[in-house]
């Protein structure tokens, strides 16, 4: 039996991270340059504000959203920032290399930084399913593989189906969620007694997680509209996301109270359920021209999120062998699928309304894009899970899952650290 004492990454982490950072610096030196075009000041400020909103979502929103565990709050916040910083650098280079043929110098613009931040956000969503199981060295591997897989998926879908930037990211939620769940399925499962002790929600960390939720709630409209070019589509995306988020908040709080025998509200459900409308409407937010449809989507999404939080964890743990600590499956993958179905229905209605007889073709194309995204997510997730199980990464023992003391310096350490 392997030792339960934590495995030190003192040599492995600095060597891996700093070598990778040096390689990225060299790549930026030889293959990138800034955009030399003269943008108008108003457009530059507006573009920067959207990028700033995305960064706040990633660093504060997702960072604190996963910090509710009693003994794993420090790692959740800091590891998310580490993955964001690394993921943005790699995504800028990768997107630049994949978007031009033959390859040449990568032109860095505010839009490319925005796109790279969204790619890094995919990693933060996926990491919610594995935080507590892995160390920083393993997360470095996960960042590199997932950003590469997402960039490849976008390039393949763009070349096959001739879609724009926004449509390339419509499968973002489904890809990130199923990638993360697949990786979690490959990792060793936590010991039952350790899980009961450490995988618990504490009051103060839970309040911090709610703070992350509030930041995400405020900036989600910017996220859904970040890659849209048309002013009308951007306006629709912002309005519809706000309506869907508002309804999902009311639904989440009401149904959470209904689901409890004494009518009490579960704060754990609130962390994700109040965001359900933003996830569900993300794929089709630019197509919806009336607020009532966005509100219906927010209502359905809130019901799915609360219902999933109450009923699905046992099924995932027992049947699928997935310990989904951050409720990734029913808060992103199921709601992402709801958004995909809504998009297909809206596209069919638009095609019929325009008198176009290509309804079957449109359904086939949309279904093909979704199937391809799922296939790449699961395949790359399996590859990542197998890589993370290699002993060279010095993964934490199952007895040390969900424990900040494995990674952080504390004034008074417990015995065994």
Swiss-Prot record:
UniProt record, GO biological process: ammonium homeostasis; ammonium transmembrane transport
Annotated GO CC locations: plasma membrane
UniProt KW keywords: Membrane, Transmembrane, Transmembrane helix
SUPFAM superfamilies according to UniProt: Ammonium transporter (SSF111352)
Annotated InterPro entries: Ammonium/urea_transptr, NH4_transpt_AmtB-like_dom, RhesusRHD
Keyword Heme belongs to the record: no
Family designation: Belongs to the ammonium transporter (TC 2.A.49) family. Rh subfamily.
Protein name per UniProt: RH-like protein IC
Organism: Gorilla gorilla gorilla
Lineage: Eukaryota, Metazoa, Chordata, Craniata, Vertebrata
């Amino acid at each position: 039996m392997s030792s339960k004492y934590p495995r030190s990454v003192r040599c492995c982490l600095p060597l891996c991270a700093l070598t990778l950072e040096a390689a990225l610096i060299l790549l930026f030196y030889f293959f990138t340059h800034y955009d030399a075009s003269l943008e108008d000041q108003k457009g530059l400020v507006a573009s920067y504000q959207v990028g700033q909103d995305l960064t706040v979502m990633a660093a504060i929103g997702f960072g604190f959203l996963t910090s509710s565990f009693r003994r794993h709050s420090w790692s959740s916040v800091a590891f998310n920032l580490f993955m964001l910083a690394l993921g943005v650098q790699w995504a800028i280079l990768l997107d630049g290399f994949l978007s031009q043929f033959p390859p040449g110098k990568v032109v860095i613009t505010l839009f490319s930084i925005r796109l790279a931040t969204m790619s890094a956000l995919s990693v933060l969503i996926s990491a919610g399913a594995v935080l507590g199981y892995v160390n920083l060295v393993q997360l470095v591997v996960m960042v590199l593989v997932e950003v590469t897989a997402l960039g490849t998926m976008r390039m393949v879908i763009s070349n096959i189906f001739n879609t724009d930037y926004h449509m390339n990211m419509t499968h973002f939620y489904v890809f990130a969620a199923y990638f993360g769940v697949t990786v979690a399925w490959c990792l060793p499962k936590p010991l039952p007694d350790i899980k009961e002790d450490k995988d618990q929600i504490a009051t103060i960390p839970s309040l911090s997680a709610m703070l992350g939720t509030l930041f995400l709630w405020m900036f989600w409209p910017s996220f859904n509209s970040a890659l849209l070019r048309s002013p009308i589509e951007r306006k629709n995306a912002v309005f519809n996301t706000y309506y869907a988020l508002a309804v999902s908040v009311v639904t989440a709080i009401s149904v959470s109270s209904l689901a409890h025998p004494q009518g009490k509200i579960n704060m754990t459900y609130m962390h994700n359920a109040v965001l359900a409308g933003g996830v569900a409407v993300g794929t089709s937010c630019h197509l919806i021209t009336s607020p009532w449809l966005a509100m219906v989507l927010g209502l359905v999404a809130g019901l799915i999120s609360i219902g999933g939080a109450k009923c699905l964890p046992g099924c995932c743990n027992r049947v699928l062998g997935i310990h989904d600590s951050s409720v990734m499956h029913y808060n992103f993958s199921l709601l992402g699928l709801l958004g995909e179905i809504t998009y297909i229905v809206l596209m069919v209605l638009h095609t019929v309304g325009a008198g176009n007889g290509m309804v079957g073709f449109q359904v086939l194309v949309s279904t093909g894009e979704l199937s391809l995204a799922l296939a790449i997510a699961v395949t790359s997730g399996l590859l990542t899970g197998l890589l993370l199980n290699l002993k060279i990464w010095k993964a934490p023992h199952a007895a040390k899952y969900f424990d900040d003391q494995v990674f952080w310096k504390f004034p008074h350490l417990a015995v065994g650290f």
